[in-house]
A protein has these predicted regions:
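Acidic anion/phosphate-binding donor-loop and adjacent secondary structure
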Residues: 39-40, 80-96
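Short hydrophobic beta-strand element within catalytic cores of glycosyltransferases
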Residues: 177-180
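Conserved acidic donor-binding segment of nucleotide-sugar-dependent glycosyltransferases
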Residues: 192-203, 211-215
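A charged, aromatic-enriched C-terminal amphipathic alpha-helix characteristic of glycosyltransferases
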Residues: 201, 215-247
């Protein structure tokens, strides 16, 4: 059914470029990272960013890479759904998942076959740790991932590149300890969170930090730190961009 719209919001550079082909209503584009960082997508995104009425970036480095230094640049990271991700007692979550009480479980940030996630580093880091399982976060619904994050001893991120991994925000919302390479906005997110660590790409360094988490055996205060990234708070910021765009169009 035909409807009239006041504004079009596209996600990713290529979709945004297609959206700007019509000239009747303003276009807002959100750039997520892969559309800027990957060579095959860069040109599409750069052109789209010049044709749009406003641009949203999930990380402050993205407009710099597109060489945008003025105009409508809005840094709004992706949010998480606090109705789906929240703390549950680890013992209760493990009981629901039928996990062993005395086994160590480390949640891996993504699918093992995603090369950018660098799972080989994770395997190297946990080698030699007795009774420890690396859990692949692939093929699960949000409810199950919430249980896994609450049941796991920690979330491990060994990525070669990220912009703003949502799984880190979701883990923080579950008070799950995090060990991560210094990618995207992770360092800023966990800066004031206890029992979370930034690691190098040295497996021995990661192993030492895993030992610190295991030895401390405590959850984090991530739920309190991450509250500003709830979906509704992010939505208000996006709506403000819509209003400013329509006012200035």
């Amino acid at each position: 059914r035909y409807k009239e719209y006041d504004l079009l919001h596209a996600h990713y550079g290529l979709s945004g470029l297609l959206a700007t082909m019509q000239l009747s209503i303003p276009v807002v584009i959100t750039f997520h990272g892969s559309d800027v960082n990957m060579k095959k997508n860069y040109l599409f995104s750069r052109i789209a960013s010049r044709l749009s009425a406003a641009n949203i970036f999930v990380h402050q480095r993205l407009p710099e890479k597109l060489k945008i230094y003025r105009g409508s640049v809005n840094i709004i990271p992706c949010g998480f759904d606090n109705n789906l991700f929240f703390p549950i007692a680890k013992e209760e979550a493990r009981k629901t998942l039928k996990w062993g009480e005395n086994t160590r479980y480390i949640a891996f940030s993504s699918a093992f076959d995603n090369k950018i996630k660098n799972v080989q580093l994770a395997w190297s880091a946990i080698s030699g740790i007795n009774n420890c399982n690396l859990i692949e976060l692939k093929g699960y619904g949000k409810e199950k991932i919430n249980l896994i994050l609450n049941a796991s001893d920690l979330l491990l991120v060994t990525s070669l590149s990220e912009t703003g991994p949502i799984i880190v925000k979701e883990a923080l919302a579950c008070n799950c300890p995090i060990i991560s390479t210094n990618v995207g906005d992770v360092q800023r997110l966990i800066k004031n969170v206890r029992n979370c660590y930034i690691s190098s790409y040295n497996p021995d360094d990661i192993k030492k930090k895993i030992s610190l988490v295991f030895r401390g055996n405590k959850r984090t205060n991530g739920e309190k730190v991450i509250k500003n990234f709830k979906l509704e708070n992010i939505a208000y910021k996006v709506i403000d961009v819509y209003r400013d765009t329509l006012k200035n169009y």
